[in-house]
């Protein structure tokens, strides 16, 4: 049986990050942007924040106690555990700051994903110091890996996934990607984890 290598993004794929940020934006700044109206992957733009506010929001959202409170996206851990049970190799690839590795790892362990490795990749060129964590990766290192199937929500990350030859990508349908043009027909919009799992199961038929 063919073993597939699977790339899974973290925020707004495994957990409801934007939902959480809408809550803290309201608490911190009285900004009321419902989740459905988060139009841009860039939250500074979506919430119309100045640089200082945006920095404060990001800091708050990445505090360990807050990271641990993110809600799991329904069906995520079931589908992923099924794939792991079938012998596939799953990697969680996040663009979160390198220093949020520990709480992110803890969140995965608490949501029955302790068997799945997590890597923090500097997807958006935000990291300044090359800290020496085992689970850090540059984009160049990511591009040296191969994947057969990916799950992503961020239009900004589509260009990363295009690097993987013949990789089918499930695009998790979110308000901020609803108008995004999908790069090619290997990208398929899915509304939930059930659809993602179905796409994965039928990948041979649709290649």
Regions found by a protein language model. Give the residues of each.
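Substrate-recognition "cap/lid" segment bordering the active-site pocket of phosphatases
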Residues: 98-151, 155-162
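Structural recognition of alpha->loop->beta junctions
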Residues: 110-122, 146, 182-205
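Acidic, Mg2+-coordinating phosphoryl-transfer loop and its flanking beta/alpha structural elements
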Residues: 149-191
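Generic beta-sheet signal
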Residues: 93, 121, 172-174
């Amino acid at each position: 049986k063919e073993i597939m290598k699977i790339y899974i993004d973290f925020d707004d794929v495994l957990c409801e990050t934007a939902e959480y940020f809408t809550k803290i934006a309201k608490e911190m700044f009285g900004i009321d942007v419902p989740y459905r109206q988060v139009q841009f992957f860039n939250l500074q733009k979506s919430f119309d924040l100045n640089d200082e506010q945006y920095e404060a929001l990001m800091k708050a959202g990445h505090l360990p106690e807050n990271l641990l409170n993110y809600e799991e996206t329904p069906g995520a851990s079931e589908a992923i555990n099924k794939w792991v049970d079938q012998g596939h190799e799953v990697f969680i690839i996040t663009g979160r700051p390198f220093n949020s590795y520990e709480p992110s790892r803890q969140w995965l362990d608490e949501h029955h994903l302790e068997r799945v490795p997590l890597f923090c990749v500097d997807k958006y060129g935000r990291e300044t110091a090359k800290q020496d964590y085992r689970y850090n990766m540059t984009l160049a290192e990511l591009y040296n890996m191969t994947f057969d199937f990916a799950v992503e929500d961020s239009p900004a990350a589509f260009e990363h996934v295009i690097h993987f030859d013949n990789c089918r990508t499930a695009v998790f349908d979110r308000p901020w990607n609803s108008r995004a043009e999908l790069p090619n027909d290997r990208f398929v919009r899915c509304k939930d984890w059930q659809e993602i799992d179905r796409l994965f199961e039928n990948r041979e038929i649709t290649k």
